[in-house]
């Protein structure tokens, strides 16, 4: 039996595929490569010594999904595929709803037809909107999202809740990520954004390597200890292991399960800059600029439910995140384009 990973050539997807292969799972990957490179899967094979079966295409393509389910004995689906830039989602809401909401719905419908009932969904802390309580627990209010990306994740969560009620065969696990950073310790796979990075650490590391002249810090007037936004940064390998734990715990269970995957600690943008400088002994020039639309001041998790139910905790600290990010960037100054 195999696991279908949509978006498996992407940043979080490729790291999760490594953990699945290391746990001796058979893996099938579907990715349209709009934000990723097929090289990531070649590197996954290098790391693990194992191959995945790869289909290039879109989750909106029902004929392709039917072909994948017909040709492979899929037992579970981990669904990463989707657009994920907060700022871009404000400019292109229709594309975000089409890819993230309609795409998820098409995938679920085809799973149902194929009799595949285990589903792990890559959600996001953005579903909490501007949180009323910090740290954020799974029972905190969702909705009130501040950008179309967050709204698209919230909408899919609502759809999944309704499907879980209506179709008791489904085992649905929703994983709400906080801010994934870092890279595999080998330096072979990591985050490789197209154009100017939307996420903080690739931005910092591209400044460090000389690809960008300086870091733009979006917003310095938030109500935080230094005025810059505070987030819960989690090492991507810890996040990947969380998917494996969720799959092992709930494969074959019925019902809906929701977990925060974070460290439970919040760091500001300037905290992260200082940590990167200290660990890697490099100066990062930065300038303070206006806030980005849709951004909030503070967001970090209470991950204790994942610890209790999945026996999962984030093991890698800030130093490891910085070290692995810089190792990946130095080894791959142009990302996968080298």
Curated annotation (Swiss-Prot):
Binding of substrate, residues: 124, 149, 179, 199-200, 216-218, 231, 292-295
Binding site for NAD(+): 11-12, 31-36, 58-59, 80-84, 99, 124, 149, 153, 178
Subunit structure, as described in the record: Homodimer.
Gene: galE
Highest taxon listed in the record's lineage: Bacteria
Signal peptide feature range: none
Function: Involved in the metabolism of galactose. Catalyzes the conversion of UDP-galactose (UDP-Gal) to UDP-glucose (UDP-Glc) through a mechanism involving the transient reduction of NAD.
Matching NCBIfam families: galE (TIGR01179), PRK10675.1 (NF007956)
The name this protein goes by in its record: UDP-glucose 4-epimerase
Catalysed reaction, written as an equation: UDP-alpha-D-glucose = UDP-alpha-D-galactose
Pathway given in the UniProt record: Carbohydrate metabolism; galactose metabolism
Family: Belongs to the NAD(P)-dependent epimerase/dehydratase family.
Keywords (A to Z) from UniProt: Carbohydrate metabolism, Galactose metabolism, Isomerase, NAD
């Amino acid at each position: 039996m195999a696991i279908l990973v949509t978006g498996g050539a992407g940043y979080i997807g490729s790291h999760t595929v490594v953990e699945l292969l290391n746990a001796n799972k058979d893996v099938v990957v579907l990715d349209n490569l709009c934000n990723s490179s097929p090289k990531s899967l070649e590197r996954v094979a290098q790391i693990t010594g194992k191959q995945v079966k790869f289909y290039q295409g879109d989750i909106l393509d029902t004929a392709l999904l039917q072909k994948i389910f017909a040709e492979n004995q899929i037992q579970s689906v981990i669904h990463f595929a989707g657009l994920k830039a907060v700022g871009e989602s404000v400019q292109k809401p229709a594309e975000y709803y089409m890819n993230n909401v309609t795409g998820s719905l098409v995938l679920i419908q085809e799973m149902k037809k194929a009799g595949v009932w285990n589903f792990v969904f890559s959600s996001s802390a953005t579903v909490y909107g501007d949180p009323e309580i910090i740290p954020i627990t799974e029972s905190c209010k969702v909705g009130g999202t501040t950008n179309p990306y967050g709204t698209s994740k919230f909408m899919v969560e609502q759809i999944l809740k309704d499907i879980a009620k209506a179709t008791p065969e489904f085992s649905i696990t929703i994983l709400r990520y906080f801010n994934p950073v870092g890279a595999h310790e080998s330096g072979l796979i990591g985050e490789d954004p197209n154009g100017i990075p939307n996420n903080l650490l690739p931005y910092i590391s591209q400044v460090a390597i000389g690809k960008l002249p300086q870091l733009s810090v979006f917003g310095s007037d938030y109500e935080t200890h230094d005025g810059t936004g505070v987030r819960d940064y989690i090492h991507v390998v810890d996040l990947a292991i969380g998917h494996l734990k969720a799959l092992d715990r709930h494969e074959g269970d019925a019902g809906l399960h929701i977990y925060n995957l974070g460290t439970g600690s919040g760091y500001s943008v300037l905290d992260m800059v200082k940590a990167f400088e200290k660990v890697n002994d490099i100066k990062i020039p930065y300038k303070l600029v206006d806030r980005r639309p849709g951004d909030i001041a503070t967001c970090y998790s209470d991950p204790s439910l994942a610890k209790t139910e999945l026996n999962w905790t984030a093991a890698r600290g800030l130093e490891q995140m910085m070290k692995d990010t810089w190792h990946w960037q130095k080894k791959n100054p142009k990302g996968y384009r080298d």
